[in-house]
């Protein structure tokens, strides 16, 4: 493609609204433009990269036996009401009414639609297994869309759905998709890691996320340092090993004693005032889970994992108690809640609290705490369980080795759904014995547009983006320094045509711009390779070749150029862990 005929509206300065590097560079490189909050236009360069990601994903889905379909983005509300997600999904589901007053939504995901499609066609075990996928625009009405393509309201996604006759078949489908994802992300050239994850609003009993590793990632991943173990999970899912040793739940403890703590609301203030360490205090945190009051107890120096609490209770929606609810349930202002005399029946405690007794806690009374709390003697705990966020001081829950944290960007998620949707929507089939059974499902998502942003987050420098050759807008840019020297320009065009004949997706910068502008734009956009054609080099029988990833420049001879170029290109692909 001749860039003199291309649309590349690059920017010299970072847009004021852009916070993360991928957002800045996608805007500056002329790849996207904002339409409104969280919604972007894909310009030619940006769409080219998105399409390359989609092509790789499509190839791996097809190779794994999935079949491509295309489903409507606008979905009838009655399907979502069948599964109960019309109310549960919350405000991220953009709801609309047609002229007849019927409810619809813009699809954030397609479990309901695909289940409706399959239940109308599949009647026998002979038609299973079945795996259908699409690559399509999704819409989620994020409360705070930010970071460009990283967390927009509208995005491009690949979503696949498997249907099997039993759990064994569903496991095979899940593993097939898991391996297909690994192949796709490897082919793209990303440094990624699959991790255990919570299933969230999608539901199901087991899932993995695929994260692109980047220091700027939103998500924190707990990883076992022992590579043989391989344990990795996001913080929502990461388990904390159960305490070892004897339980102190019913150990001897002095009688409860109230102590005045005037104006001391936080753990830090209370412990400093009483002259004790934070690990001697029990925090009482109050929530509603699907509207039901729930209390959770953790050690004063720990952070509660509300996802673990929600899953333990068995609910969908968890919310921190309001100030009014705290006063109603404790009889005290915020900051003085405790488990003794609490007007909440369901109290859960982190299992770490079994290892000690004689705790300090709120007294459910203003400006007052209690000392000598025994959880076994003084209050009724429904269940002790893993409720806190893992730390780097905790051992690996699988092997006991050390844990370390790393940052990641979620670009894929695979779920075992079981019969969650097939039962609620009556998607059944007749088995070998003629009995009606619910289909066993799985769903598998990849953020196609998000991968483009993630690649930049992982690979960039002060000059711009550094794309893997597989998904760069163009793999190589031929830069002519000829200016008005038509002989140089003609030679540059010869190289461009030769590269195109070799199957290289090349751009030819034939714009009437200064060399500095061309070099700056090439670095900004992130073409993996640059081929510079100048009069001086041609006289010396060479052209200059630049590796964008390393910045290394070499000279390729005019005589024997093709073989020298192929060898150089192969080295660059190999540096990305790829085969040219």
UniProtKB/Swiss-Prot annotation:
Tell me yes or no: is Transferase among this UniProt entry's keywords.
no
Keywords linked to the UniProt accession: Aminoacyl-tRNA synthetase, ATP-binding, Cytoplasm, Ligase, Nucleotide-binding, Protein biosynthesis
Q: Name one GO biological process term.
A: prolyl-tRNA aminoacylation
What EC class is this? Answer: ligase
Task: List the subcellular locations.
Answer: Cytoplasm
Main localization category: cytoplasm
UniProt comment concerning the protein's domains: Consists of three domains: the N-terminal catalytic domain, the editing domain and the C-terminal anticodon-binding domain.
Recorded protein name is Proline--tRNA ligase
Q: Which organism is it from?
A: Maridesulfovibrio salexigens (strain ATCC 14822 / DSM 2638 / NCIMB 8403 / VKM B-1763)
Gene assigned in the entry = proS
